[in-house]
Amino acid sequence: MKQYLLSVHMVEGAPARSDEEIQRSYQAVDAFNRELMASGGWVFAGGLLPPDTATVVRAQGGKVVTTDGPFAESKEQIGGFWVIKAADLDAALEIAGRGSAACAGPVEVRPFQDVPEAG
């Protein structure tokens, strides 16, 4: 099984959702997470705080420099993610479609690089 990153994208300036819509989304995501766990596809997941809570860390000239705010100035930021196991890209895309429906937002799918096992 290969691992994939499913990134949930939040669009800056999108219409605010009602408390009821947010609760429905939380419930749908919780059900989706339970499905992933039951199927053996779950590796890890998390929701992120807004981009204004980010700190960028850079090593420059032998020093570590930190900057408040997101790395990229963009209308879209990652709001959360899943790391999943799937048989292939088609299976990962199918899972991402269910995740997108659950969180009511776009989900980007990216495979992890294959890393040789240590030994």
Residue ranges and their predicted role:
Residues 1-119:
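Conserved, structured core segments of small domains
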